[in-house]
Amino acid sequence: MNATFSKRRKSLIVTAVAVAAAGGVAAAVVPAFAAGGARADHAGHAGGDAQGIVSRSGTAAAGAGGTVLAASLRGANEVPVAGGPAVGDKDGAAVQFVKVKGDKVSVAVAWRGTGKPTALHIHQGAKGTNGGIKVDFGGLIGKESGLIGKEKGKGNGASKGHSLTGTVTVKDRALLNALKTDPSSFYANLHTAEFPGGAVRGQLHKVTVAKFDFRDALDNFQASVFKGKQIYECKPAEGGGYAFAQRDVSAVLGGRIAHSFVAPNSGTPQWIARDGSAVTGAVLSKTPNGERNIPELDLKATQSGKHRGLLADTAEILRLNTVGGVAPAGSCTAGAIVGVPYQADYVFING
């Protein structure tokens, strides 16, 4: 990425956060800054031995290549244990990237709305369950030598966001292979002093299209739905009768990114930033997320707006942590249109 434009783009991201906060947007863009903290307990999750870690570095591994994973962390994803320590910071959020290359596992995480991390792990466990620690990034906390963003060189003084990058060595080949081939069976978890059992967590997902130098991982960002509806129209159904089918989507994301179809019934989603940069999306894969929630998506992004701006480098989009938005069931009156509220996190990844 051009250095001058990279600085301009980061400025745009920060501006988007400030605008969203002023407008009362609770879930806005997660920017890339840096801060640290001290370790604490992680009781409340099954134990583990952080298999195979033999060394740690405060700098994320450079270069492309390897398997890149992403997670959008929310307090609502935490699973409490009866009698266990506090979990689930309802105000917290984080976006995390992980790269597995050889025996090196790199992490880049940015958080907001929650305290400084006291522990940072990858656990093995499905959504809704607690699992053992498999990779422990705790040794990187307080060693953030690779600061990213406008606050580079200013230590831990960033007030608009915090981030951490680094690399650990893992010698367990079976674990490394499982991370690469079945990432959704693992989750990222960030602990704080207030929530020692886990403040925010999110399942890992493979980044399939976008290619970027992992040192620039936190140039990617997360924007959550501030207000949105999945829009359905009653249409003839296969096998006879009528049923609701997708007509459109209408949503405003953090940073005031507008989300809709390029035209009703087109089936092609688009995201338009206030600066005129924009992308359309084509679904690569769908992951069910419960009967009451629309599926999570991996989408290939195609540029459709200005060549400079917030979305100008976006090559892939992950729709994660979906809540609601499912089409009404049963019969309906032909032509009827309904909007079903939904929530989701969108992770915009550069190519």
Go through each PLM region and give its residues:
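Metal-centered catalytic cores of metalloenzymes
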Residues: 2-120, 124-238, 342
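Primary mode marks residue(s) on the alpha4-beta5-alpha5 output face of response regulator receiver
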Residues: 209-231, 238-351
